[in-house]
UniProtKB/Swiss-Prot annotation:
Segment forming the signal sequence: 1-21
Organism: Plasmodium falciparum
Bias type Basic and acidic residues, positions: 74-151, 164-176, 185-197, 206-326
Protein name: Histidine-rich protein PFHRP-II
Biased composition (Basic residues): 152-163
Length: 332
């Protein structure tokens, strides 16, 4: 009986020890889970706060002097941007692929929304433009460096290798000014904001010093335009994209009052156009050279790209959707 009682006491002691150990483990696990949950919630909150302004910017460094470059809608998914917001290795430009000082153009030189545009924003290999892959001095670009002095730049996303989209005052609210290749020097674009679909210009050169080039609706897909610079108030160009009859204007630079030219296409040397603003469908000009000092030289109903921008508008309009999709789970 004594031996049996000792066994009962021993069993009870073992059971109590196991129960205590189990309780301690439960308390430890609960505490650990609580800490993990708090840490996870903190991480989620920090991630949410971070992505409010720099969505999916991998290694973005120094978005310098970008005043209100936050609230850039869809300026996301930039990788290794240096001195730029939410861009992939863009050097001084936002979301332009190797654009040099140009906006939304492929190798455009000093022109906006051209393929190979030089000095334009939102172009592939654009130098000094915003919204470019490897853009220099612009925000929301792949390898963008120094998107400086971009005041209120909105939606200047998706340019590859753009360089120096500097001094773009109010380049904000550029709706879908993306996907220009090798644009160069879209610098000194004052109020190049609210350019709706200013994408896809090929080889435009020097769309620099475009004062108030803002509100250009669909000013995209200009191929090999050279020196569309010094366009003062080239704003409110509705469907200046993808050459709604302003196609084939190579070097449509410095055209004074080439604005409101409806279907002014295939103009050679349309330079010195002051107030080229409100040019309805003055886009997609291919290799036009120096329609200089054409005061209101608007060609009515010229051919080559009546709404050819549709496929570009498709490509440019909300092209950031997949980036939103990619970051949707992270945001929530």
């Amino acid at each position: 009986m004594v031996s049996f009682s000792k066994n009962k006491v021993l069993s009870a002691a073992v059971f109590a020890s196991v129960l205590l150990l189990d309780n301690n483990n439960s308390a430890f696990n609960n505490n650990l889970c609580s800490k993990n949950a708090k840490g996870l919630n903190l991480n989620k909150r920090l991630l949410h706060e971070t992505q409010a302004h720099v969505d999916d910017a991998h290694h973005a460094h120094h978005v310098a002097d970008a005043h209100h470059a936050h609230h850039a809608h869809h300026a996301a998914d930039a990788h290794h941007a240096h001195h730029a917001a939410d861009a992939h290795h863009a050097h001084h430009a936002a979301d332009a692929h190797h654009a040099h000082h140009a906006a939304d153009a492929h190798h455009a030189h000093h022109a906006a929304d051209a393929h190979h545009a030089h000095h334009a924003a939102d172009a592939h290999h654009a130098h000094h433009a915003a919204d470019a892959h490897h853009a220099h001095h612009a925000a929301d670009a792949h390898h963008a460096h120094h998107a400086a002095d971009a005041h209120h730049a909105h939606h200047a996303a998706y340019a590859h290798h753009a360089h120096h989209a500097s001094d773009a005052h109010h380049a904000a609210d550029a709706h879908h000014a993306a996907y220009a290749h090798h644009a160069h020097h879209a610098a000194d674009a004052h109020h190049a904001a609210d350019a709706h679909h200013a994408a896809y210009a090929h080889h435009a050169h020097h769309a620099a010093d475009a004062h108030h080039a803002a509100d250009a609706h669909h000013a995209t897909d200009a191929h090999h335009a050279h020196h569309a610079a010094d366009a003062h108030h080239a704003t409110d160009a509705h469907h200046a994209a993808d050459a709604h009859h302003a196609a084939d204007a190579h070097h449509a630079t410095d055209a004074h009052h080439a604005a409101d030219a409806h279907h002014a296409t295939d103009a050679h040397h349309a330079a010195d156009a002051h107030h080229a603003a409100d040019a309805h469908h003055a886009t997609d000009s291919h290799h036009a050279h120096h329609a200089a000092d054409a005061h209101h030289a608007a060609a009515h109903h010229a051919t080559d790209a009546h709404h050819a921008a549709a496929h570009h508008a498709t490509d440019a309009h909300h092209a950031a959707a997949h980036h939103e999709a990619a970051t949707h789970c992270l945001r929530h």
